Every structure is written in structure tokens, then in C-alpha cells.
Amino acid sequence: MWSFKKIWFQLHWLIGISAGTVLVLIGLSGAVFSFHEEVLDWLNPGTSSVTLRDAPELSPSALAQAVQASGETRRIDRITVYSEPGKSAQLTFAAEPGQRRGEVVFADPYTGKVLPEQKGKDFFEWVESLHRWLLLPRDDGKPITGTLAFCLLMLSLSGLYLRWPAKPLS
């Protein structure tokens, strides 16, 4: 005769094997993605940082004017200037129609010169897409990863229930 705990154990095992394999993939891709800034900084030393100068850094409005004077016609949506000396500024352009995010470029905060594009950025965009949406279109992958997160929560709770001793220690 099957008891409730035996049936629950079988369900726990089945869901754990099924969802667990995909959850491992999500976890590993998340671990890789968590280091994307450090790896990109290491791969692109001339893009993420600039040589320190005695001159003052440009103000955000002067930086935007310098970038647009270099021939850039797209609308600048956001400028990120770091307080850390020698760190390049980031400019995010407005998203094109049909895109969720605009392109990000780096600029020298002293001159406004646009710096070369980062190498390795496409790889980390792929890793992020794997982690968040399992390389599926966003509207298809988001409910799947949400369901897997719910399965992880249920597996954790059912694992506690299954592991809990039948008789407490006296």
C-alpha cells in the first residue's frame, strides 16, 4: 500500500530530476553571468578605463555634446559617469523601435572620444538570454523559468517535509 509520504517522495524525485537538470543550467549560467563586468573589464582594458589626466572630466552635458559632435545622431537616453578616477563613461542610446534596450557605448570622460566596442559582450548577452529565458523568445521563456523557480521552491519545501523525522527526538 502506498502511503502519502511514499507518493510525495516519488513526485519529489520526478520533479527534481526533470526540473533539476534545467535548474542546474540556469544556475551555472547565472554563475558565469555574475562575473560579466569583471571579465569584460579584463578583456577590454582600453574601453572600460582610460589614462588618468590632470585635466578635469567633462560634465555630462559637455560629454553628450562631444559624442554627438563626433557624428553620432542617435538620441542619448542615459549617461553614467563614475566617481572612480580613470573609469570611462557609459552612454546609453534610446532603444530602436522593436528593441527593449538601446546600445551602450563607452567614452573618454576627459575628451568625449567614443572608445572601441567591448569584445565579449555578445557572449554575455547570450549567457544572460540562456539564464533568463533559456534562449527562447522572452515571452515564451519567462513563464518557463518562472515555473521552474516555483518548482525549486516546492522541491525545497517538500524536501524538508520528507526529511523531517516522524518522531521528534525525546
Model-derived regions, located:
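Conserved histidines in hydrophobic membrane contexts and catalytic metal-binding motifs
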Residues: 1-170
